[in-house]
Structures are given as structure tokens and as C-alpha cells.
């Protein structure tokens, strides 16, 4: 399902209404979501007995029909106990955690014995079709055949295999979208906001491109195959300079050197003044720290909250953001945004550094645009004009249809070598006029006003 449509409550309703006699159940989820499952059970089904798997408290200790809640890490640590217990239901929440069939945690889930198996996810196609094979290796081990035969068929006839795959999997997938289920949800307005580059950014970007091309050559496939570390390092440096040159390890720059942060602060002025709440997402915690600094300078009285992978109590900042009466900004790392938080008190979302996985972005946005939202949600993807960021956005738009063919819009990463043969074409800065940037910003403002 898309995020926020009540997968948790649906599963708990099933476990309560149709239990397997005398069998315990197992719910496996990211560690940050364990408290969420416990709270939902206590709230809606207080008669159901629960227990949390941890060191010193495991399956051997009790044999009654309890609902075990386990993080993926704890399940892996207790793998040797799995042959000793058979569950009624085995539920994997955020099933993309087992997308890599070679990972130890994935192998552990394959060892689970149960009468029924359920996987909950909004994004099973995060990277490649093998992710889907891995999920179904847990659900129905023989359905898609061996991994080697599956990959051979894909390599021989990708289009034909994807068509057959969709038909083969359709009976086993319940795919619900907001437009089907949450018809009361207000509109979501999405737009790319093109950000200008400062002279410092432009100079650093050009220098990094030049040095990267000298080291890697112009053949994207060869660079990925033979110098993958250098290729990824080049992409990371270019993304960093697009956001803020201060993120480069060899520079210390004032906030004014970042065109993206400058435009963000400018866009926030009217939003905050009008009393709205805002969620700002980034993959870079370092960039969020810089935005926090800029917000403190420009809006010293603004209430700020933060949620990153380093946040110990993930529930607290979300709850405080949801309940505070004043305009507020929540700074969230994409890594922390994937699971277990609701932020629908906000109605403005800024994605500071969109990249090539639309599924990750959708997960983040769905923290705001979900059941309970009562306002139109405005989503800005901040894309630095004329750079690799803009090229990746164009690529995502043109290739979305390819991934729609498999399971209706679940999204996925892209192999850059399939779409760019020339590294220079991928990374080199193109000359974008500031007039275009201003036009796009004006159009974005118009979209808000029209709504």
C-alpha cells in the first residue's frame, strides 16, 4: 500500500479475528517501529498478549499464543531458535528490509516457520527486480523459481519477463492507493523548484567535473565497472556542491554561498508568516545542520524540531511537532523518515536534495500526506538548475512508466549506464539563466495561490 492507509491496523484486525489456534504470531519490523506496534495493539486490541524479542527474553521462555514483536536485528540474533517454534502468522513490516537475498537478516527471515506469511511495504521495487524475488522467496519460496533462473530470464528478455511477472504476482498482491481508499484526502501539489547557483558553487562544480573526467574518462559504463568508488565519490561531491559548498571537506563557506539554502529561506518567509508547519527532508544530516543554522539566523523565534538517525527517542519530536500551536519546522533525514512517524500537522514539504529513487521520496512525503491530513499539501523538490540534479529529475520523469508496468507505480532506482553513455553529458554544468529560475519560482507561487 501507499503510506498512511492503515496497514498496521488491518493486520492486527486479521490476527485478532482469525487467530491460528494455540500458535504464537510474529511481527518483524525496524527497531524504531517496535513501540508503534505495541501502542497500536494496546490501543485497539488490549486483550491481545504481546511480548518483545530481546536478549534474555525469547521464544523458548513462553509457549502460549502471544504476539511476538521483533526488530530485524533481534530476529537475526535469535536465528538459532527459529527451528524450535512455529508461528501462526509471520508478518514482515517494511518488507524492503529483506530486499538483499544475500544479507544475513534476509536469510534469517527465510528460516521462519509459519502457517501464514504477510509482507507489508509501500516500496518493494526500491532498487531492482531482485528485491521482489527476495520478498517472494520469503512469502512463496518456489513461486519465482531459483535466483539464477530468475536473473537469466530478466537478462534474456526483460520486457517479456516483467509482463509475465506482473501477471504471476497479481493474485498475491493487495495494492491500495490513496486515490482508491482515502478519497477524503486533500490535494497534493508537487513541483520542482529550480535553485540558482552562486558563483562559488558554479566554480566548485566546474572544477569537480573537470577533475572527475580526468580521473574517470568519459565512458560511464567503464567508470562504474572499473572505478566504482571514484564514480560514486564524484556524484556525491557534485550533489554536495549543489546543496551547499560548505559540505565539501576542503571548504568553509558562509551560508550566503548556497543558492539552495538562500531560496529555501526566502520561500519559507511567507509560509511561516501565514502560520503553517513545514517538514524539510534531506539525505545529508550535515545539510540539515546548515539549514538549522540559517533558520535560527532568519527566524530566531521559530520553533524547530529535528529527527535523524541519531535521534534516540523518535516518537517525541514527532508528537511535539504535531501538537504545538505555533508555526514550526521539522528537519528530517530521509533515513529516519521511512518508518513509524506521522507529520500530517504540516502542509508544506521541501525535499532539499532529490535523487533517483522516487520510492524513498514518496515514503517521506507520505509522512505528511496521509489519513488525518485536512489541508492541501505543497511539495517542493529543490533542484539546482543545469546540474546533475536536474538531469536525474528528467530521467526519473521519463522512466517512471517503465516501473509502472511491473506493479503499478512502486518506483525504483535506475542504472545510469543504461541512460548515459557519456560522463560529461551526465555531470557537466549547463548554462541556465536566472530568468528561468525566477519564472519557475513564480509559477510555484502561482500554484499555491490558485489552490
Model-identified regions with their sequence ranges:
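Inter-lobe coupling linker of SF2 helicases/translocases
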Residues: 69-70, 74, 80-84, 143-250, ...
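SF2 helicase/translocase NTPase motor core
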Residues: 19-103, 150-154, 259, 264, ...
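Generic structural signal for small/hydrophobic residues in well-ordered secondary structure
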Residues: 3-4, 11, 27-30, 41, ...
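Short, low-complexity, charge-dense intrinsically disordered segments
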Residues: 435, 439-451
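Hydrophobic residues on the short alpha-helix immediately C-terminal to a glycine-rich phosphate/catalytic loop
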Residues: 14-18, 37, 135, 208, ...
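SF2 helicase/translocase ATPase core recognition
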Residues: 99-100, 104-107, 112-148, 182-210, ...
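Walker A/P-loop NTP-binding motif
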Residues: 8-22, 108
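Conserved Helicase C-terminal RecA-like lobe
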Residues: 10, 19, 183-201, 206, ...
Amino acid at each position: 500500500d501507499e503510506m498512511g492507509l492503515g496497514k498496521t491496523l488491518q493486520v492486527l484486525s486479521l490476527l485478532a479475528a482469525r487467530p491460528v489456534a494455540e500458535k504464537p504470531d510474529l511481527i518483524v519490523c525496524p527497531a524504531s517501529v517496535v513501540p508503534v506496534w505495541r501502542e497500536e495493539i494496546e490501543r485497539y486490541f488490549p486483550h491481545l498478549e504481546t511480548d518483545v524479542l530481546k536478549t534474555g527474553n525469547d521464544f523458548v521462555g513462553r509457549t502460549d499464543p502471544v504476539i511476538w514483536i521483533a526488530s530485524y536485528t533481534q530476529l537475526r540474533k535469535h536465528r538459532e531458535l527459529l527451528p524450535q517454534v512455529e508461528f501462526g502468522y509471520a508478518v514482515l513490516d517494511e518488507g524492503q528490509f529483506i530486499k538483499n537475498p544475500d544479507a544475513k537478516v534476509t536469510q534469517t527471515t527465510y528460516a521462519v516457520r509459519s502457517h501464514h506469511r504477510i509482507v507489508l511495504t509501500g516500496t518493494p521495487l526500491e532498487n531492482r527486480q531482485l528485491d521482489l524475488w527476495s520478498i517472494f522467496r520469503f512469502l512463496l519460496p518456489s513461486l519465482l523459481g531459483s535466483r539464477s533462473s530468475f536473473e537469466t530470464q530478466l537478462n534474456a528478455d526483460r520486457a517479456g519477463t516483467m509482463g509475465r511477472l506482473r501477471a504471476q504476482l497479481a493474485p498475491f498482491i493487495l495494492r491500495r492507493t490513496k486515490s482508491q481508499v482515502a478519497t477524503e484526502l486533500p490535494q497534493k501539489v508537487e513541483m520542482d523548484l529550480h535553485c540558482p547557483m552562486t558563483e562559488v558553487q558554479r566554480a566548485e562544480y566546474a572544477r569537480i567535473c573537470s577533475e572527475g573526467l580526468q580521473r574517470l574518462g568519459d565512458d560511464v559504463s567503464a567508470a562504474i565497472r572499473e572505478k566504482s568508488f571514484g564514480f560514486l565519490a564524484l556524484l556525491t561531491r557534485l550533489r554536495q556542491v549543489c546543496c551547499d559548498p560548505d559540505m565539501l571537506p576542503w571548504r568553509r563557506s558562509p551560508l550566503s554561498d548556497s543558492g539552495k539554502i538562500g531560496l529555501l529561506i526566502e520561500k519559507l518567509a511567507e509560509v511561516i508568516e501565514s502560520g503553517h508547519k513545514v517538514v524539510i527532508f534531506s539525505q545529508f544530516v550535515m545539510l540539515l545542520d546548515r539549514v538549522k543554522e540559517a533558520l535560527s539566523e532568519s527566524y530566531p523565534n521559530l520553533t524547530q524540531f529535528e529527527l535523524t538517525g541519531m535521534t534516540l527517542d523518535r516518537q517525541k519530536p514527532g508528537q511535539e511537532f504535531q501538537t504545538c500551536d505555533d508555526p514550526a519546522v521539522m528537519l528530517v533525514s530521509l533515513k529516519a523518515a521511512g518508518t513509524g512517524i506521522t507529520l500530517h500537522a504540516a502542509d508544506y514539504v521541501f525535499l532539499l536534495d532529490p535523487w533517483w529513487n522516487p520510492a524513498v521520496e514518496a515514503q517521506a512525503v507520505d509522512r505528511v500526506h496521509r489519513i488525518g491530513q485536512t489541508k492541501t499539501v505543497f511539495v517542493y523538490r529543490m533542484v539546482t538548475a543545469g546540474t546533475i540534479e536536474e538531469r536525474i529529475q528528467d530521467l526519473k520523469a521519463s522512466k517512471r512508466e517503465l516501473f509502472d508496468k511491473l506493479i503499478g507505480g512502486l518506483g525504483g532506482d535506475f542504472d545510469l549506464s543504461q541512460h548515459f553513455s557519456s560522463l560529461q553529458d551526465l555531470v557537466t554544468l549547463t548554462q541556465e539563466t536566472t530568468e528561468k529560475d525566477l519564472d519557475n519560482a513564480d509559477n510555484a507561487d502561482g500554484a499555491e495561490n490558485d489552490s
